[in-house]
Amino acid sequence: MKKLTSENSHRQQKVASIINEALIEILHRGKMLDPRLYDCPLTITKIIVTADLKIANCYFLPFNTKLTPQEITESLNNSKNAIRNFVTGKINMKYSPDIRFHYDHGFDNALKVEQLLKDTNNI
């Protein structure tokens, strides 16, 4: 039985890195994307590729935008096929991973923890 580890293999990290570079390039160009993404600066915070390299979970953080995280996720998912085709051209694999977009709640959670710590210090 195969041992499950939380560590990513070198191959997973390499695929995540290539996907990250391709995402940055296509988001910068803005071609073939949902029009709502044109004026929506995004940071790709992390990409986690499954062990079988079939799924890439991409976490993003928007900056200075009027769109909600749900609207941005919807826009990215509407553009998923164009993004996947672009990534396929950059990656040398038999199958291109399915790209799934998620809002990164890490920053929001850090702010909540910081506020809780401030509140407890004031007691």
Swiss-Prot record:
Annotated GO CC locations: cytosol
An MF annotation (GO) of this entry: ribosomal small subunit binding
Keyword Glycoprotein: no
Pfam families tied to this protein: RBFA (PF02033)
Domain of life: Bacteria
Keywords for this protein: Cytoplasm, Ribosome biogenesis
SUPFAM superfamilies tied to this protein: Ribosome-binding factor A, RbfA
GO BP terms in the entry: maturation of SSU-rRNA
Gene3D superfamilies from the UniProt entry: 3.30.300.20
Family per similarity comment: Belongs to the RbfA family.
Subunit structure: Monomer. Binds 30S ribosomal subunits, but not 50S ribosomal subunits or 70S ribosomes.
Summary of the function given for this chain in its UniProt record: One of several proteins that assist in the late maturation steps of the functional core of the 30S ribosomal subunit. Associates with free 30S ribosomal subunits (but not with 30S subunits that are part of 70S ribosomes or polysomes). Required for efficient processing of 16S rRNA. May interact with the 5'-terminal helix region of 16S rRNA.
Protein name from the UniProt record: Ribosome-binding factor A
